[in-house]
Amino acid sequence: MNYAKEINALNNSLSDLKGDINVSFEFFPPKNEQMETMLWDSIHRLQTLHPKFVSVTYGANSGERDRTHGIVKRIKQETGLEAAPHLTGIDASPDELRQIAKDYWDSGIRRIVALRGDEPAGYEKKPFYAEDLVKLLRSVADFDISVAAYPEVHPEAKSAQADLINLKRKIDAGANHVITQFFFDVERYLRFRDRCVMLGIDVEIVPGILPVTNFKQLGKMAQVTNVKIPSWLSQMYEGLDDDQGTRNLVAASIAIDMVKVLSREGVKDFHFYTLNRSELTYAICHILGVRP
């Protein structure tokens, strides 16, 4: 293989897209005043890129839910962006979930990310799966509903095939958009996308992209998500524990390489896990041709 020609081909394929790329961004509710400032600075910076939507994660308890609701409403009011709250079936009855969904609809929210949610230790209630939540949302209003997918298999799934069948159930229940867990093995994502097509899943499988600025934090996240960390990725961050600037450059380089290959493979929608930071996501979007 002529690697120089391949690199040129990747760069040329990006330039040929000419703005034919959609991006979306995920944020989470801040825990203190400093993080609150960082969140809104990031939202306003990334707002200029005209994302397809932005999503806000969600905790199981009512306080977290209220914070998510408040952020989503403020995003919509201040920026005009389509804001999608995460919603889970944990720690809320079906009637409560219907009321939450109705409140969102009445507030002008038209998109929801529907998840089962992580069951806390000692949780004994009957599971309310994402498929059930999608059906419930469909019974309330005509939401655009995003659900999660796992190219490297959900940690609780019995098998890769069982996990894929579960995704198909969520689509059949009424979901019309899929966002994947973050990953670093692009080939694994592409094979997963092919298997989705073979099973009759005909919605866009949007890759979740995580620019890694904190490798230690990534290790903790990978343990609970079943995401494989390649050895080459570990080596990239060796010796950088106290060098945030270089870590940022490494993170941007890795993510940019991923989106170049994915775009060459026909991917036109990308979902960025921003961790409430805008700098790297903004730079990666610039490379993709997504600009103010």
Curated annotation (Swiss-Prot):
* Positions contributing to NADH binding: 57, 181
Pathway(s) served: One-carbon metabolism; tetrahydrofolate interconversion; Amino-acid biosynthesis; L-methionine biosynthesis via de novo pathway
Recorded hits in InterPro entries, A to Z, give: FAD-linked_oxidoreductase-like (IPR029041), Mehydrof_redctse-like (IPR003171), MTHF_reductase_bac (IPR004620)
Q: What class of enzyme is it?
A: oxidoreductase
Q: What is its EC number?
A: 1.5.1.54
Its cofactor is: FAD
Which GO terms are recorded in the biological process aspect for this UniProt protein? methionine biosynthetic process; tetrahydrofolate interconversion
**Enzyme active site:** 26
Q: Which GO terms describe its molecular function?
A: FAD binding; methylenetetrahydrofolate reductase (NAD(P)H) activity; methylenetetrahydrofolate reductase (NADH) activity
What this protein catalyses is: (6S)-5-methyl-5,6,7,8-tetrahydrofolate + NAD(+) = (6R)-5,10-methylene-5,6,7,8-tetrahydrofolate + NADH + H(+)
Plastid as a keyword of this entry, yes or no, is: no
> CDD domains under this entry?
MTHFR (cd00537)
User: What GO CC terms are in its UniProt record?
Assistant: cytosol
Q: Does the keyword Oxidoreductase apply?
A: yes
Cite the entry's keywords alphabetically.
Amino-acid biosynthesis, FAD, Flavoprotein, Methionine biosynthesis, NAD, Oxidoreductase
Classify the source by domain of life.
Bacteria
Residues bound to (6S)-5-methyl-5,6,7,8-tetrahydrofolate: 118, 181, 217, 277
Residues at which FAD binds: 58, 60, 86, 116-118, 130, 150, 154, 157, 163, 166, 169-170
Family recorded in the similarity comment: Belongs to the methylenetetrahydrofolate reductase family.
Purpose: Catalyzes the NADH-dependent reduction of 5,10-methylenetetrahydrofolate to 5-methyltetrahydrofolate. Is required to provide the methyl group necessary for methionine synthetase to convert homocysteine to methionine; the methyl group is given by 5-methyltetrahydrofolate.
Quote additional remarks.
Answer: Present in outer membrane vesicle formulations which are used as vaccines in human.
- PANTHER family to which the protein is assigned, alphabetical: METHYLENETETRAHYDROFOLATE REDUCTASE (PTHR45754), METHYLENETETRAHYDROFOLATE REDUCTASE (NADPH) (PTHR45754:SF3)
NCBIfam families cross-referenced by the UniProt entry: fadh2 (TIGR00676), PRK09432.1 (NF006950)
The name this protein carries in UniProt is 5,10-methylenetetrahydrofolate reductase
Q: Which organism is it from?
A: Neisseria meningitidis serogroup B (strain ATCC BAA-335 / MC58)
